[in-house]
Each structure stands twice: as C-alpha cells, then as structure tokens.
UniProtKB/Swiss-Prot annotation:
Its EC number is 2.7.7.77. The N-terminal domain determines nucleotide recognition and specific binding, while the C-terminal domain determines the specific binding to the target protein. Its main location: cytoplasm. Gene3D superfamilies: Spore Coat Polysaccharide Biosynthesis Protein SpsA, Chain A. InterPro entries: MobA-like_NTP_Trfase, Molybde_CF_guanTrfase, Nucleotide-diphossugar_trans. It comes from Campylobacter jejuni subsp. jejuni serotype O:6 (strain 81116 / NCTC 11828). This is Molybdenum cofactor guanylyltransferase. Pfam families: NTP_transf_3 (PF12804). Belongs to the MobA family. GO terms for biological process: bis(molybdopterin guanine dinucleotide)molybdenum biosynthetic process. Transfers a GMP moiety from GTP to Mo-molybdopterin (Mo-MPT) cofactor (Moco or molybdenum cofactor) to form Mo-molybdopterin guanine dinucleotide (Mo-MGD) cofactor.
Length: 191
C-alpha cells in the first residue's frame, strides 16, 4: 500500500479557544493554515479533504461536514462524519494545527496498515496523538455508538479497537499550534 492510494482529511472544526481565533485561518506565507496543510498533503495523498462543521472556506476545498445526527462539538463527531464518507479503507486524519507532520512521519506509520490494526496513531514520549493517524472506515459505527452514549473522546476507541501506537522520539514534529506564541514562533521558523 502506498500513500498516494490513500485519502487524507484535515480537521478544521476545533473551537480554537486557547488560540483566541480560528486556527484554520491563521496566515502562513500568504495562505491560511488550511491551505498550507492541503497543499502539502496533496503532493502525498490521492485526495485531501477538509472536515468542519460548516463550509467556512467558500467551496475552496473538498469538504466533509460534521453529521447533523448529533448536536455536539467534538473530535468523535468529526471522526464519525469522516469515516462515514469512506468504505473499506484507511483514512489519514490530522488536525489542521499540526503543521510539522510530514511524509517522514507518515512513512513510519504506513507499514502497520498491512497488519491487523484498525487504528495507527503517532505517539511521542510525552503524548499520544489521536488526531495524527490512520483510521479504518469500518470504525464509523463504533464512533456512532460512543456518540449515542455522549462519549466524545477519541481515546476511548483505543481500549476497544486494535490500535498501534507508532513511537516517535521528536516531540517537535507533532507540535500543536494551541497558543498565539506557538503560531508566531512557527511562522518565524518558516522564513
């Protein structure tokens, strides 16, 4: 299996409460963070989609909207909505605010898709990264079951589904832009 045979979905529906503004629209090199991620991953994957509650990008991207079945704002709803759009395949899911994840990290996770796992996510010494990994589309129903019980955390899947945590040493590769200072620092590194 090759990365260019797979689909990628960039999650852009978070509340961005710590950032104080919509992270998906932060500007990097004359484009917003969503464009930055879509452009980068379009060179790697078959298709790149954007997941959000509504189309805040004016049809600029292939959009997967959150399901209206549940009136919540959560990563589990986004994952359910994403996986419901695919059949019998793995999908790479990444939050928009992880701009340093790239092909090297993906290639380290890729071999595990051929093994007997349904979830393959990145793990560093300090954190598991549930919004950086491959999820099999067959998990949509499991996500729905959690939502029906008002369980919103993606981490709940790991105890029920065969999951591979792929170990990475470099915390920096999985940087999340949660605060404005982190965004400013990352922006200055791009110059």
């Amino acid at each position: 299996m090759q990365l260019n045979e797979l689909n990628c979905v960039i999650l852009c529906g978070g509340k961005s409460s710590r950032m104080g503004q919509d992270k998906s629209k932060l500007i990097l090199k004359n484009q917003n963070l969503t464009q930055f991620q879509v452009e980068k991953f379009s060179k790697i994957f078959k298709n790149v989609y954007v997941s959000a509650k509504e189309d805040k990008f004016e049809n600029h991207f292939s959009l997967i909207k959150d399901s209206l079945e549940f009136e919540v704002y959560s990563p589990m709803l986004a994952l359910y909505s994403i996986l419901s759009n695919f059949k019998n395949e793995f999908v790479f899911v990444l939050s928009v605010d992880s701009p340093k994840v790239g092909e090297n990290e993906l290639l380290k996770m890729l071999p595990f898709l051929e093994q007997n796992y349904k979830i393959i996510i990145a793990k560093t010494p300090l954190h598991k990264h549930p919004l950086c990994g491959f999820y099999h589309s067959s998990l949509a129903q499991t996500c729905k079951n959690f939502l029906e019980k008002n369980e919103q955390k993606i981490g709940l899947l790991f105890s029920e589904i065969k999951t591979k945590f792929v170990e990475f040493e470099d915390e920096d590769a999985f940087l999340n832009l949660n605060f404005y200072e982190e965004y400013e620092k990352f922006k200055s590194e791009l110059r």
